[in-house]
Amino acid sequence: MSKNSKAYREAAEKVDREKLYTPLEATKLAKETSSKKYDATVEVAMRLGVDPRKADQMVRGTVNLPHGTGKTARVIVFAVGDKAEAAAAAGADVVGSDDLIERIQGGWVDFDAAIATPDQMAKVGRIARVLGPRGLMPNPKTGTVTPDVAKAVTDIKGGKINFRVDKHSNLHLIIGKASFDAEKLTENYGAVLDEILRAKPSSAKGRYLKKVVVSTTTGPGIQVDPGVTRNFLEA
């Protein structure tokens, strides 16, 4: 839905740009203003009161969405031997080591998450410049560097997503599909917000949640009241 299209303009007219909506109001409105041509992804964007240039103000972590993302994540695993077999059995899309690294060095990045066993990280470091900027670099803090690759694959396939604040202090996360019930989208939103609040750096000063916006991929942005941090299903 192009921002210049009639459909987008009509959708945008339904949104009060001066209002701060409750989470449930926002997800209902996101569904209502979504394109009817396809099942759009619903996202939440947040601006945080942190300075990510400071190491002690980097906000990152994982969240398990209770209702999943609505899409099947493509997961790759860097592992060999029994660990590689376990990853494949758990449903990893691609499993490898040097061969997988070479493939990525050749320009292939058609996946949503990367997992590695600890012994593979020295090799994976060779493609850090490719994976890092895309938020795909395996990291112990997000559970993607682990000897239990099977569990990591199962978690991600089941709706576990990673988050990391960008250099502009923004976060972008998927909370589902427009076909989800508004209540399920709101419960996913609540799970996300809980984790973001839990990840607040102790050194962050002032207002932490500066702005929260819910939207579908191509729909208008809907501002959510950042002061609503509990009882998410109340209208």
Swiss-Prot record:
The record's section on PROSITE patterns has: RIBOSOMAL_L1 (PS01199)
Under InterPro entries, the record lists:
Ribosom_uL1_bac-type, Ribosomal_uL1, Ribosomal_uL1-like, Ribosomal_uL1/biogenesis, Ribosomal_uL1_3-a/b-sand, Ribosomal_uL1_CS
Which BP terms from GO are recorded? regulation of translation; translation
Which gene is transcribed and translated to give this protein?
rplA
Is the keyword tRNA-binding in the record? yes
Name a single GO cellular component: large ribosomal subunit
Q: What is the protein name for this chain?
A: Large ribosomal subunit protein uL1
- Summary of the function given for this chain in its UniProt record: Binds directly to 23S rRNA. The L1 stalk is quite mobile in the ribosome, and is involved in E site tRNA release.
The molecular function terms of the Gene Ontology recorded here are: rRNA binding; structural constituent of ribosome; tRNA binding
Q: Which UniProt keywords apply?
A: Repressor, Ribonucleoprotein, Ribosomal protein, RNA-binding, rRNA-binding, Translation regulation, tRNA-binding
UniProt family annotation: Belongs to the universal ribosomal protein uL1 family.
Subunit info here reads:
Part of the 50S ribosomal subunit.
